[in-house]
Curated annotation (Swiss-Prot):
Domain of life: Bacteria
Region (Disordered), start-end ranges: 288-307
Name used for this protein in its record: Fructose-1,6-bisphosphatase class 3
Record's keyword terms, sorted: Carbohydrate metabolism, Hydrolase, Manganese
UniProt cross-references to Gene3D superfamilies, sorted A to Z: 3.60.21.10
Catalysed reactions, as listed in the record: beta-D-fructose 1,6-bisphosphate + H2O = beta-D-fructose 6-phosphate + phosphate
Family: Belongs to the FBPase class 3 family.
Protein species of origin: Staphylococcus aureus (strain NCTC 8325 / PS 47)
GO terms of biological process kind: gluconeogenesis
Length: 654
């Protein structure tokens, strides 16, 4: 095979490129276009974290752009519309279908409704013009409803300088109304506003967990115009289960049972839990208090006694399977340093006690019926069969395949983006702030290199689903529970102790020193430098740990270098945080942190127009307005420009 020189490769590349730009005019037009785009203000980035399956609250934050929609409406209309009119317009943009029904029911005749249509279309066109003022016409066109692009563009770019087209514009709108297209046009315009106020979405981890509708969140994200995902520990647990890790699968089923969310498995993903229920009914009792499902905050109707009994039994069955499955992994991976988590081997089955970390505790609420005390790792044949069936069902679920593939395609363990570092959990460090080392396959890694190796193995496990006990699959589980995991961020997961030991001191999970060192500005600067980012300009944007604002905790740490945006979408955390989560906005003028009040119901917004927002705090104002050339996208565009200029000189100027 002949070796191609770099010069020949460059020539072939330019030959291919010249097929798209076969005249100097075409090439010049593209260069002019790209150079001009670099001078536009950077788009608004929207950061959300720790969604935990709370679809309704997440949907609302997306629809209101963390208050951005209302801010734009106020900018234009505050002096022209009453408070009620402002509220109605805001609710219409958030929930156009529902608000339209309410508004239309208030009108007595078609004439009044038609006047409202004309006024509302004018307001929405004006709003779109304002929201799109920093975009090219091409980018705006992509945000408009396809079936109405022509009409909307005519209305957007109309000129009142001359009267020649006055009746033309009036007829456009009147015909839309007469042909019964006004509702659909208004709905399309409302969604265009939602899209235009946020250029790019960052989901900083944990789409999955105890909330009831992570599948709906995934469907929403798949259809979102521009986003990235930094995996959370719960996301990786689901990826691991789909990739072939039975212990990850057992963990997520246990969590679903604990929080009465098994309908995610059965109804959302179509996975049959009947074999697991049959096993559970055979071996376990219904009256074990440690395994009764938690009450769901979003469920008004109580579980029937039969439903609670079934879930309690399933919960015990899958927990025991989980503890058994952990044993062989811990034994074949001594570098995981998890010998203390061989919990079933540490139980004294005669005295009903366990010795862990040098302390002996009596056990309560035990359910060791299926444990072979001579070989605690041994699964019963029925348990083995159930796990094989469940894994097969998981891997054959088309919807789950689509969701997990999207997580892999759009996700990563961390992301440097526009000078900031986005990471869900932590960067494992010791008490002195030095990066902790972890051995994988005979090599030692730390810091960014460790995270890169972890991510490589997540992707390898996902690509090789037929391998269920290889190193890569074991490492996905380690990311969920290991002490050097960037996602877990603690020294040990005390699941067993929480079920079976009354002494709460044994439940404590010691956090990685990262979580107190991140208050130190010099430490954060060092971490930014280690990841190749400018410590003077960059920040770390973090999720994973709920910010307890109710206790005075501040999400802005280390002189603004560290921003923690998990305030608790999860209803379960809201009593401890005092709020319903943080989100972050980063536009060309700077950063704003938004604290959200608990989202109760969209009905209140529809009827009263009052949004449960959101207190904004300015994190930072840019001294100079940031342009696209200052962003990741700008660097990509500049690289394209450099290549196009090379082609221009090679073909047309030399």
């Amino acid at each position: 095979m002949t070796q191609i020189t770099e010069k020949e490769l460059k020539k072939k590349y330019l030959d291919l490129l010249s097929q798209n730009f076969d005249t100097p005019e075409k090439l010049a037009t593209e260069i002019i276009n790209l150079e001009s785009i670099l001078e536009l203000p950077k788009g608004t980035e929207h950061f959300v974290s720790d969604l935990h399956g709370e679809y309704e609250a997440f949907q609302h934050v997306l629809r209101n752009g963390s208050g951005n929609v209302r801010a734009k409406i106020n900018d234009i209309f505050k002096e022209r519309l009453s408070t009620k009119e402002l509220n109605d317009l805001t609710a219409l943009v958030y929930y156009p279908e529902d608000k339209l029904k309410l508004i239309k029911s208030d009108f007595q005749n078609c004439g009044q409704l038609n006047v409202w249509y004309i006024t509302t279309i004018e307001h929405l066109i004006e709003l779109i013009k304002y929201c799109s003022s920093k975009y090219t016409r091409s980018k705006l066109r992509k945000a408009l409803p396809k079936q109405y692009v022509y009409i909307i563009e005519e209305l957007l770019y109309k000129s009142n300088e001359y009267q020649n087209k006055k009746s033309y514009y009036e007829t456009l709108v009147n015909q839309v109304i007469e042909l019964k297209q006004a509702d659909d046009l208004i709905i399309g315009l409302a969604y265009s506003v939602q899209r235009l106020v946020v250029d790019h979405l960052h989901v900083v981890g944990d789409i999955y967990d105890r909330g009831p509708q992570p599948d709906k969140i995934m469907d929403t994200l798949i259809n979102y115009h521009s986003l990235d995902i930094q995996w959370g520990n719960h996301d990786v647990l689901w990826v691991g289960a789909y990739a072939g890790s039975k212990v990850c699968l057992a963990n997520l089923l246990r969590i679903c049972a604990r929080y009465d969310n098994l309908d995610i498995i059965e109804d959302a993903y179509g996975i049959n839990l009947r074999p697991l229920l049959t096993l559970a009914e055979k071996y376990y009792d219904a009256d074990n208090p440690a395994f009764k499902p938690k009450k769901r905050p979003d469920k008004h109707e109580r579980l029937t006694q039969r439903e609670e009994s079934q879930i309690t039994k399933i919960h015990q069955a899958i927990a025991m399977i989980q503890f058994k499955l952990e044993i062989p992994i811990i034994k074949r991976r001594p570098n995981f340093e998890m010998e203390e988590r061989l919990v079933l081997e540490k139980v004294n089955y005669d005295t009903n006690e366990i010795t862990v970390y040098g302390n002996t505790y009596p056990l309560k609420d035990t359910c060791f019926q299926t444990v072979n005390r001579d070989n605690p790792a041994e699964l019963l044949p029925e348990e083995e069969e159930v796990m094989n069936k469940l894994l097969l069902s998981f891997q054959q679920s088309e919807k789950l395949r689509r969701h997990m593939s999207f997580l892999m395609r759009k996700g990563s363990l961390y992301l440097p983006y526009n000078g900031n570092l986005l990471i869900h959990g932590c960067i494992p460090v010791d008490e002195n702030g030095e990066m902790e080392s972890f051995e994988i396959d005979g090599h030692t890694y730390s810091g960014q290199e460790l995270l890169d190796v972890f991510e490589y193995h997540v992707r390898k496990s996902f690509d090789e689903k037929e391998n269920t006990d290889d190193l890569s699959t074991d490492l996905v589980w380690y990311l969920w529970t290991g002490k050097y995991s960037s996602l877990f961020g603690k020294r040990a997961m005390t699941t067993f102790e929480r079920y079976f030991i009354a002494d709460k001191a044994s439940h404590k999970e010691e956090k990685n020193p990262y979580y107190h060192l991140r208050e130190d500005v010099n430490m954060v600067r060092k971490m930014l430098s280690d990841f190749g980012l400018n410590p003077d300009e960059g920040r770390i944007i973090n999720g994973h740990t709920p910010v307890k604002e109710i206790n005075g905790e501040d999400p802005i740490k280390a002189d603004g270098k560290m921003l923690v945006i998990d305030g608790g979408f999860s209803k379960a955390y809201q009593s401890t945080t005092g709020i319903a989560g943080y989100t972050l906005l980063y536009n060309s003028f700077g950063m704003q942190l938004v604290a959200h009040q608990q989202f109760n119901a969209k009905e209140k917004i529809l009827s009263e127009g009052i949004d449960e927002l959101s207190i904004k705090r300015v994190v930072d104002k840019e001294l100079q307005r940031k342009k696209i050339r200052d962003t990741n996208i700008g660097k990509d565009l500049q690289a394209q420009i450099d290549i196009l200029k090379m082609l221009m000189h090679d073909r047309y100027l030399d």
